[in-house]
Amino acid sequence: MYNGHPLVYVPMSADIIHPGHINILKIAAEYGDVMVGLFSDEAIREYKPEPYMNFEQRKIIVEALKPVRYVVRQESRDYEPNLRKYQPEFMVHGKDWREGPLSTVRARAIDVLAEWGGKVIEPDYTKGISSSVLKAKVRGGKA
């Protein structure tokens, strides 16, 4: 509980907001108050090219989204520090982290959340849209 309501943690970079982000946030809002763990610029650079917008610009946009109640800085892809600090009842993350390099991050997040009875919710990604595809189009000059 955070301010008397179930807290739902949603990590994201939110460099290019698209319908998939909105869908994830709407799903998260069904479980409680949404707290976005917005990746810092440094955290994004660990796994993606330079963000188009800096942290403060992205924060302004994310704070304006209807389902979002709180925005906090996510310093790395290691969710444990923020999970321990805020102790959400739920964390919402797309299914892409079940395999590959993020599978260990996922396992750790599940273990940490379980310490206080928290759960991970993994909705399907929105078909036909992704930040990576949109960025490739922008960088390539094709729309």
Whereabouts are the PLM-identified features?
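Nucleotidyltransferase catalytic core that binds NTPs
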Residues: 1-143
